[in-house]
Each structure stands twice: as structure tokens, then as C-alpha cells.
């Protein structure tokens, strides 16, 4: 099946109906394995047991940026290729991305309290992630505020692509500025600096959370497609009722005119 085939909403619904149960099962299994391995991971010699917040915080932080990247690609599909499902994909991803970003901020604050002595600092990375969260909320508000779906899709696509400039700022903020966050320890030149007892559970949790996003995203896209179909049917029904009312009114006027003429 090609991308052109997936452009057909009916085929997309049929495919995802078959795939989603398997994705959900894989997500649950990997989450269970990851949580079990995270619980068995040793305490850090400096951070103690609080280091285990990392197994939730890092996947959420990674997905907060990944989801915006997915939305940026979908926005290109809206503006350049006019893919029928591009706006559906972007709109369905926004609430999920906002949730991951909120969880990243929340778990980061809980992790930062014992390490930094405070829940919040106007650190470069913290601030840029907060801006990302606000951008998610802004896009969600835009889709709700604009009644015309095509106008909303184009406006959201432009804002998403403009907002993508924040992604490298988040990623490289620890290198460009003096921040409280440590430099990358998993994906870096020369290999990861994490011990395997931390690295393996972290990677399992990252894959599990990514599968969770894919599962939620496909389910949300299905709901959005069905919602738009219902809205389209409601508009068609309203148009038919309005047309029937006009025809009925016109018929009554003609009958009244004929009666007057006969009299």
C-alpha cells in the first residue's frame, strides 16, 4: 500500500482498524517491561532514587519535540502536496503533543526540586519547552476558533512550520547557553555515557512511549475523520432542509397567486 492509497480516508480507516489492536498490545507489553526494568535499575550515587524519574521524563521530553516534527511534516503536506489527511494528522497530534510536553515539564520540575532546590528556573531549556507547550495550546485554540476548515488548516500549517524553529533551540540550548541541564548523554558523538543499567530501561521506555504516541495518534486521526464526515452529513442535511423549505414556500406562494387569479 502506497502513500497515495493512504490518502483515501476510507482505506486509512480500514488499515488502522486492523493495525491499532496490535499497536496497543505492543505498547502495553513494552511499557510493562520498561517499568519493570526501571524499578530494578540501581539508585544513582549522587541523585539516589530520584534518578528514576528520568525513565518517564526523558521519553516525554523526546516526544514533545518529535510530535511537533510530525506536525511540521504534516503541515508541509497541507501547504505543498495538499494531502487529504495532512491536516487531520496535524490536528490529531496537537493535543497528544501538548500532553507529552506538559508531562515533561511536570516530571522535570519534580526531578529538579531535589537536584536544584527549586521546581522552576528560567533556564534556557525549561523556557523553550514552556514556549513549545504554549504553542501547542495556541494551535489547538486556532483550530477551534476558525470555522472554515481549509482556512484553519492553512493558518495552522504556517504557524507550525514557523514554530519548528524552536526545536533546535530546545535541543542545543545546553550547548549554546550556560544552563542547569547537562549535555546530551544518550545520543552523542562517541556513544552514550549512561551505564547499561540505566540505558536499556530508558531505551525501552522511549520505544514504548513512541508506540503509545503512534497508537493514540492513529486513533485520534480516525476520530477526526469520522467527526468531519458527521459534520459534512449534517451540513448536507441542513442544506436539503433549507432547500425543501424554500421550495415549499415558493409552492405555497404560487398556489396563493393562482387562487387570487381564479377569484
UniProtKB/Swiss-Prot annotation:
Compartment(s) of residence: Cell inner membrane
Transmembrane annotation, as ranges: 19-39, 61-81, 92-112, 126-146, 157-177, 198-218
GO MF term list: heme binding; heme transmembrane transporter activity
A Pfam family this chain is assigned to: Cytochrom_C_asm
Organism superkingdom: Bacteria
GO BP: any one term: cytochrome complex assembly
Keywords associated with the record: Cell inner membrane, Cell membrane, Cytochrome c-type biogenesis, Membrane, Transmembrane, Transmembrane helix, Transport
GO cellular component, one term: plasma membrane
Main location: membrane
Membrane topology label: Multi-pass membrane protein
UniProt keyword Membrane present: yes
Summary of the function given for this chain in its UniProt record: Required for the export of heme to the periplasm for the biogenesis of c-type cytochromes.
Homology family: Belongs to the CcmC/CycZ/HelC family.
Protein name: Heme exporter protein C
Species in which this protein is naturally found: Bradyrhizobium diazoefficiens (strain JCM 10833 / BCRC 13528 / IAM 13628 / NBRC 14792 / USDA 110)
